[in-house]
Amino acid sequence: GAEQRHWRYRRRVPLSMNTMPAALIGLPALCCLHETNLDKAGPSSGAAAGPTGMLCPVTHVEEGAMSHYDPLIDSAAARLGRVLEHLGQRVSTAESCTGGGIAEAITRVAGSSQWFETGFVTYANSSKARWLGVEPATLEAHGAVSEPVVLAMAAGAKAAAEADMAVAVSGIAGPDGGSAEKPVGTVWFGWALSDGRVVSECKRFQGGRREVRAQTVLHALERLVSEAEKTAANRSSV
């Protein structure tokens, strides 16, 4: 964590505001984010139109500690593991902007080899095409951060890993790379589910690069949990 990195630096160079690199100043007290549910937000509520005309809700940020997200992510990953073990199902991931963060969170859970199949980190467009079967024409027409691409990524990850469900993310974590149409913080999600559905969602997160990535990991896991729990409930009612 941030405290450990701070300690390692202090072992080598005495810390002071004059000697500490700017990137390390305040590192143990990074931003904490508070997510506001604006899934049904309209144009007047601060939502931005996504590349396909869908609304990307803006997630607002409050100051605090980045460590706020760690227990939430760990809790979501643990819940996912419990329900997938109950179902006898396995999940795979396809990540771009999070760089393997979802898979890393999953594998922090002891025993996750029982329900986690494969993690794909397809950062480059060529990797999305090669490993997940995303058509180059789709990437060319819509860009990597788009609904058609994450839907294809999710379906490709599920098929390639022979998993029961999969999640895919592609976004602009910043600090650069945004545009008027796709500002920094825009993230597209895709979930390929065990019942054959492939669903998508767009979010607009605020904060720095780490904050955007943390929120992305958390939301990806929470939706997986929600969908897996629905499957478990449906089985119980039969």
Show where each model-derived region lies.
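A general signal for intrinsically disordered, low-complexity N-terminal leader regions
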Residues: 9, 44-45, 63
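Short, often N-terminal, low-complexity regions
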Residues: 14, 21-34, 40-42, 48, ...
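Residue-level detector of transmembrane insertion/anchoring sites
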Residues: 7-10, 30, 85
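Serine residues within intrinsically disordered or low-complexity segments
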Residues: 16, 44-45, 236-237
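Short alpha-helical segments enriched in small residues
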Residues: 60, 64-238
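Low-complexity, intrinsically disordered or signal/transmembrane-proximal segments
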Residues: 4-9, 34, 60
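Low-acidity, Ser/Thr- and Arg-rich intrinsically disordered low-complexity segments
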Residues: 8-12, 16-18
